[in-house]
């Protein structure tokens, strides 16, 4: 008998394993990662706000990325921690919808924001004399606002379409959060139009920003090759290396999950990759942007007694 989506009051999240010992081990690992993410990103945001030396476009974007990663991780990890140690693996229909909406909105926003950072790096390296004028605080704020608006507008579209399906099968989600592909597996009805829309949103929100990032780095490489001194060359490379590492890890994870042909898709492998970009990546992003950064280290020394 079919059940329409309004009769589904909750979903069951299978998570990673049913073994109690392994669940406890995962709880400890995820708690440690989440604690580092919260403390580290919060500290970085405070440093950027308090230290005038960090009041530059580059650190403005870094601070916003830290805020986004902090928010992004908080959408998933608290529920994952509860699921690991609780007998109750359920999530309400409204809770699943909210988790889906915010996760999609923040994921899309990060794609746009990473593209904005790439543009900032391009201007800093290719047009250093015009950098302060070109990357004004108004433009930086506008780029961040557009990133969030674009992300959440598109998230509203895909959330509405996804949760308008009739969930006529079991309400068991083979994942640790309310992700797109496991939810679509539970839905019944014609999905052809939905899949077209899904891949259109993937192209417009993920592929297009990736193309902009690639174009920015092609221009950056062209500019770097014109630098005669090895010191200037290394400085330009170090300016971009952290961002390029972050982009590669983030886009690689997303494209692996959502862009692979359906026949090669594995829910078990998806769980591992999803864990990386939802839980681990926000912590890695913090390390990538701050641990090797001399300005951040100096600001931290000033803050600590």
Curated annotation (Swiss-Prot):
<feature type="disulfide bond">
    <location>
        <begin position="96"/>
        <end position="188"/>
    </location>
</feature>
<keyword id="KW-0716">Sensory transduction</keyword>
<keyword id="KW-0552">Olfaction</keyword>
<feature type="transmembrane region" description="Helical; Name=7">
    <location>
        <begin position="271"/>
        <end position="291"/>
    </location>
</feature>
<feature type="topological domain" description="Cytoplasmic">
    <location>
        <begin position="120"/>
        <end position="138"/>
    </location>
</feature>
<protein>
    <recommendedName>
        <fullName>Olfactory receptor 9G1</fullName>
    </recommendedName>
</protein>
<dbReference type="GO" id="GO:0004984">
    <property type="term" value="F:olfactory receptor activity"/>
</dbReference>
<dbReference type="Pfam" id="PF13853">
    <property type="entry name" value="7tm_4"/>
</dbReference>
<feature type="transmembrane region" description="Helical; Name=2">
    <location>
        <begin position="54"/>
        <end position="74"/>
    </location>
</feature>
<dbReference type="GO" id="GO:0004930">
    <property type="term" value="F:G protein-coupled receptor activity"/>
</dbReference>
<keyword id="KW-0297">G-protein coupled receptor</keyword>
<feature type="transmembrane region" description="Helical; Name=3">
    <location>
        <begin position="99"/>
        <end position="119"/>
    </location>
</feature>
<feature type="topological domain" description="Extracellular">
    <location>
        <begin position="75"/>
        <end position="98"/>
    </location>
</feature>
<feature type="topological domain" description="Extracellular">
    <location>
        <begin position="258"/>
        <end position="270"/>
    </location>
</feature>
<keyword id="KW-1003">Cell membrane</keyword>
<feature type="glycosylation site" description="N-linked (GlcNAc...) asparagine">
    <location>
        <position position="5"/>
    </location>
</feature>
<feature type="topological domain" description="Extracellular">
    <location>
        <begin position="1"/>
        <end position="24"/>
    </location>
</feature>
<comment type="similarity">
    <text>Belongs to the G-protein coupled receptor 1 family.</text>
</comment>
<feature type="transmembrane region" description="Helical; Name=6">
    <location>
        <begin position="237"/>
        <end position="257"/>
    </location>
</feature>
<dbReference type="InterPro" id="IPR000276">
    <property type="entry name" value="GPCR_Rhodpsn"/>
</dbReference>
<keyword id="KW-0807">Transducer</keyword>
<comment type="function">
    <text>Odorant receptor.</text>
</comment>
<feature type="topological domain" description="Cytoplasmic">
    <location>
        <begin position="292"/>
        <end position="305"/>
    </location>
</feature>
<feature type="transmembrane region" description="Helical; Name=1">
    <location>
        <begin position="25"/>
        <end position="45"/>
    </location>
</feature>
<keyword id="KW-1015">Disulfide bond</keyword>
<keyword id="KW-0812">Transmembrane</keyword>
<feature type="transmembrane region" description="Helical; Name=5">
    <location>
        <begin position="197"/>
        <end position="216"/>
    </location>
</feature>
<dbReference type="InterPro" id="IPR000725">
    <property type="entry name" value="Olfact_rcpt"/>
</dbReference>
<dbReference type="GO" id="GO:0005886">
    <property type="term" value="C:plasma membrane"/>
</dbReference>
<keyword id="KW-0472">Membrane</keyword>
<feature type="topological domain" description="Extracellular">
    <location>
        <begin position="160"/>
        <end position="196"/>
    </location>
</feature>
<dbReference type="InterPro" id="IPR017452">
    <property type="entry name" value="GPCR_Rhodpsn_7TM"/>
</dbReference>
<keyword id="KW-0325">Glycoprotein</keyword>
<feature type="transmembrane region" description="Helical; Name=4">
    <location>
        <begin position="139"/>
        <end position="159"/>
    </location>
</feature>
<keyword id="KW-1133">Transmembrane helix</keyword>
<keyword id="KW-0675">Receptor</keyword>
<feature type="topological domain" description="Cytoplasmic">
    <location>
        <begin position="217"/>
        <end position="236"/>
    </location>
</feature>
<feature type="topological domain" description="Cytoplasmic">
    <location>
        <begin position="46"/>
        <end position="53"/>
    </location>
</feature>
């Amino acid at each position: 008998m079919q059940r329409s989506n309004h009769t589904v009051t909750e979903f069951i999240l299978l998570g990673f394993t049913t073994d109690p010992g392994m669940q406890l081990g995962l709880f400890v690992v995820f708690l440690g990662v989440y604690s580092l993410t919260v403390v580290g990103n919060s500290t970085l945001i405070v440093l950027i706000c308090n230290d005038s030396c960090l009041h530059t476009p580059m650190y403005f974007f870094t601070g916003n990325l830290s805020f986004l990663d902090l928010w992004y991780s908080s959408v998933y990890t608290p529920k994952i921690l509860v699921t690991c140690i609780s007998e109750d693996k359920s999530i309400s229909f409204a809770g699943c919808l909210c988790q889906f909406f915010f996760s999609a909105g923040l994921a899309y926003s990060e794609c746009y924001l990473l593209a904005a950072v790439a543009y900032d790096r391009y201007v800093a390296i290719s047009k250093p004399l015009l950098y302060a004028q070109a990357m004004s605080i108004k433009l930086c704020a506008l780029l961040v606002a557009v990133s969030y608006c674009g992300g959440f507008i598109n998230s509203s579209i895909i959330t509405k379409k996804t949760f308008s399906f009739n969930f006529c099968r079991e309400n068991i989600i083979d994942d640790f959060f309310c992700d797109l592909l496991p939810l679509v597996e539970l839905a019944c009805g014609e999905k052809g139009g939905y899949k077209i829309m899904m891949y259109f949103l993937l192209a417009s929100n993920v592929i297009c920003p990736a193309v902009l990032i690639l174009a920015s780095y092609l221009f950056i490489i062209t500019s770097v090759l014109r630098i005669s001194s090895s010191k200037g060359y290394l400085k330009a490379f170090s300016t971009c290396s952290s961002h390029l590492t972050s982009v590669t890890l983030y886009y690689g994870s997303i494209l692996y999950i959502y862009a692979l042909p359906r026949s090669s898709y594995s829910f078990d492998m998806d769980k591992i990759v999803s864990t990386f970009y939802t839980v681990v990546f926000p912590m890695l992003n913090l390390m990538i942007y701050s641990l090797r950064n001399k300005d951040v280290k100096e600001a931290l020394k000033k803050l600590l007694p």
